[in-house]
């Protein structure tokens, strides 16, 4: 009995000791006073560098938001933005993080926040991206090195935050993260570091060839180019030269100058004022000035860059101020290094991973650069789990309750792979369609796409169908009756000091 009691005491002491040790370890990363944090934010944040310069050619920066919902405290979500070389703080402060910065330098809670679905981890990577830094001026960037560096970082992260080691992990991101995510997932599986619950890639740059192949078709489908017109024929010729270049280089890696020229022709010519205005390549519903064509979008970027470059913001996030002096959204040096190395398709990795890991490919329909037609082309040719493509399976619409009688998007799901489209959404779906994105990703995290509303469901308090408009029409009638009845009571009984006798009429002065 005494030995059992002693064992319990020792175990308890060990647990308390480990908890205190974890607290001390976490203390150096705790975000204690984030500038202009919303007063109603109830979560906890950790951020900083893991001091791995002995293992890496620099140090990666992370920012983690703990789940505000206890039921999801053992689900963790890694979010990565693309580029290559673009900071994941785009995701933390403009897309899926708990709050967003407005033009008054104040933060508002984000209705599309994902920290209500699990712990959220944002990492600036590869080295040299965002708050991360590289010690080597002529640093190397390619998918193999990127994935290896990330795995080294992640091993250390789990040492510092051991409570996250047994979580179910999802990896999500967009754009060039269509390269990052499959390579990182494969490396983490190879090292058996985490339990992978799924991968979600938005408007992903997965197979370069499929994007260039579909650009002209996308413009025609959207009514922006008439294929039979002089412009359509010119672009068709430019498009053919691009595809010929791909045939010559075989794998899709190498010199893409013909394809870049094709893209340049589109941005210059598909406009009411060629050379002055152009479409926003990330959201075709928006116009831009040439030659930016969307590179200055989202427009929040100007004040986000200014805020994240302040000493106050960097100090609060435990940024190494000796190595990092400001924040920039994208590092051109990282992009150039990737361009030199060449970019191959990551579709083979996706094909291998989906055999054991659920994957969601989602696309904002207004994105030109990484458009949904390229995703459809990819999935049609992809062979996974014993079959090719979705086997003529039809896409199902999904709706947001109470928002509209029109579908918010559509999805098709089979054999561990789901393909989804979000109506009128941009390259950054969570940025401009946060509720649709949160609805979709919740179904994915829970492996329950059947929960997505497949028919219009107006808000419960408004009924459904024509009853909604009946209720809305009755509201002003009811208010009028209440007001008239109140006036009657006041005059009849002198309520609230408004009896007929209270004031005598005042005659006008002659």
UniProtKB/Swiss-Prot annotation:
User: Organism's domain of life?
Assistant: Eukaryota
Q: List the EC numbers from the record.
A: 3.4.16.6
Q: Which GO terms describe its molecular function?
A: serine-type carboxypeptidase activity
InterPro entries named among the record's database cross-references = AB_hydrolase_fold, Peptidase_S10
- Catalytic reaction list: Preferential release of a C-terminal arginine or lysine residue
Any keyword Transmembrane helix? yes
> Which regions face the Lumenal side of the membrane?
22-468
Query: Where does the signal sequence lie?
Result: 1-21
Which key words tag this protein in UniProt? Apoptosis, Carboxypeptidase, Glycoprotein, Golgi apparatus, Hydrolase, Membrane, Protease, Signal, Transmembrane, Transmembrane helix, Vacuole
Provide the membrane-side ranges marked Cytoplasmic in the record.
490-510
Q: Where in the cell is it found?
A: Golgi apparatus, trans-Golgi network membrane; Vacuole membrane
Gene Ontology CC, one term: trans-Golgi network
Membrane topology according to the record = Single-pass type I membrane protein
Enzymatic class? hydrolase
- Which residue positions carry a glycan here? 51, 104, 392, 416
Q: Which residues cross the membrane?
A: 469-489
Q: Which residues form the active site?
A: 175, 367, 427
| Protein task | Protease with a carboxypeptidase B-like function involved in the C-terminal processing of the lysine and arginine residues from protein precursors. Promotes cell fusion and is involved in the programmed cell death.
Q: Which family does it belong to?
A: Belongs to the peptidase S10 family.
Q: What is the protein name stated in its UniProt record?
A: Pheromone-processing carboxypeptidase kex1
Name the species this protein comes from. Schizosaccharomyces pombe (strain 972 / ATCC 24843) (Fission yeast)
Q: What is the lineage of its organism?
A: Eukaryota, Fungi, Dikarya, Ascomycota, Taphrinomycotina
* Gene for this chain: kex1
């Amino acid at each position: 009995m005494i030995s059992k009691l002693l064992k319990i005491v020792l175990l308890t002491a060990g647990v308390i000791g480990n908890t205190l040790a974890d607290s001390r370890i976490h203390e150096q990363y705790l975000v204690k006073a984030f500038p202009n944090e919303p007063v109603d934010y109830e979560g906890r944040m950790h951020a900083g560098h893991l001091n791995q310069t002995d293992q890496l050619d620099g140090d990666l920066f992370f920012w983690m938001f703990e789940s505000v919902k206890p039921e999801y405290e053992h689900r963790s979500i890694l979010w990565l933005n693309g580029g290559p070389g673009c900071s994941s703080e785009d995701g933390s402060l403009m897309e899926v993080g708990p709050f967003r910065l407005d033009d008054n330098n104040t933060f508002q809670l984000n209705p599309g926040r994902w920290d209500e679905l699990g712990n959220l981890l944002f990492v600036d990577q590869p080295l040299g991206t965002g708050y991360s830094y590289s010690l080597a001026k002529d640093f190397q960037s390619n998918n193999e090195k990127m994935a290896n560096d990330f795995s080294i970082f992640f091993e250390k992260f789990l040492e510092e935050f051991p409570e996250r080691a047994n979580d179910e992990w999802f990896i999500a991101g967009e754009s060039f993260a269509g390269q990052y995510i499959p390579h990182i997932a494969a490396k983490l599986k190879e090292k058996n570091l985490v339990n992978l619950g799924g991968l979600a890639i938005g408007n992903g740059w997965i197979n370069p060839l499929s994007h260039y192949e579909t650009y002209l078709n996308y413009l025609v489908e959207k009514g922006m180019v008439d294929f039979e017109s002089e412009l359509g024929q010119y672009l068709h010729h430019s498009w053919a030269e691009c595809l010929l270049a791909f045939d010559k280089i075989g794998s899709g890696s190498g010199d893409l100058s013909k394809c870049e020229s094709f893209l340049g022709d589109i941005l210059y010519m598909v406009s009411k004022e060629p050379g002055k205005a152009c479409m926003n390549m990330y959201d075709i519903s928006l116009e831009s000035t040439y030659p930016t064509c969307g590179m200055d979008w989202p427009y929040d970027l100007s004040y986000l860059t200014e805020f994240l470059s302040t000493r106050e913001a960097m100090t609060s996030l435990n940024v190494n101020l000796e190595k990092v002096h400001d924040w920039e959204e994208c590092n051109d040096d990282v992009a150039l290094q990737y361009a030199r190395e060449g970019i191959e398709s990551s579709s083979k990795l996706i094909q291998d991973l989906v055999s054991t890991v659920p994957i969601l490919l989602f696309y904002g329909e207004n994105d030109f650069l990484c458009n949904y037609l390229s995703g459809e082309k990819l999935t049609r040719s992809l062979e996974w789990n014993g079959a090719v493509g979705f086997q003529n399976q039809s896409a199902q619409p999904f709706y947001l309750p109470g928002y509209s009688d029109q579908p918010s998007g559509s999805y098709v799901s089979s054999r561990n792979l789901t393909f989804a489209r979000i109506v009128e959404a941009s390259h950054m779906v969570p940025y401009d369609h946060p509720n649709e994105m949160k609805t979709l990703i919740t179904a994915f995290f829970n492996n329950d796409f059947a929960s997505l509303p497949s028919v219009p469901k107006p808000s419960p308090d408004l009924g459904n169908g024509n009853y909604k408009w009946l209720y809305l029409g009755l509201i002003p009638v009811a208010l009028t009756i209440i007001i008239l009845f109140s006036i009657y009571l006041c005059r009849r009984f002198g309520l609230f000091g408004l009896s007929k006798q209270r004031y005598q009429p005042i005659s006008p002065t002659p």
